[in-house]
């Protein structure tokens, strides 16, 4: 076994942020719920680092506006820390997020109920793509159980299997899910699901590119880009439950495209907040 190294970075977070609120959100995130922790003031998670697909553990703490990210692993720990900042949306300058509340009272209420929430849940576009495949035509609870079983049987001490490992697995899964997971793994190894690259693209262009991966349709591709790459300003146009939430909160006849004009440049964040409130109220299915 390679020697484990530890690396710590401090990052100044611009705009509203609460580690406690984000952690609570992730703990209730059905596709990949965050497990329990021994440290009540920290968020800890285990994942594959995109640049080399090694396993890393990250522990994040907050002191006012500063995030301390400590990563442990045997790979590229600078990349591991950067990835942790991305999947917790700590690398987003959110000083303009409060301005969205000034333009939209519905989002103002959402911000008040979820103070400092930054979207999180998937460690990478690769993991989001794998979830998109697993959850097709299955109940969320059932898909989450399958995902957890894959991690338990084939993962690396709590981390989802790397693409190289996933390609070797002959999984007994419904339909063509095994075939599609192999396609996702191959795409990840080819760089098609690279988080930094998808972040650098215009969101609709990134979604179109991801749809080139076998097994990923419009809904799955949006999930990969908006939640996997954690793009802050994209619009999930294939989320039926979000459309229902728009009708409930803005009134009949209002559309997502109409109300989201006021959300720029944080359309993803606004959508996640509305879905989180719907889940909290018990009127929606688990978030995905």
Mark where each language-model region is.
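HhH-family (HhH-GPD) DNA N-glycosylase catalytic core used in base-excision repair
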Residues: 1-288
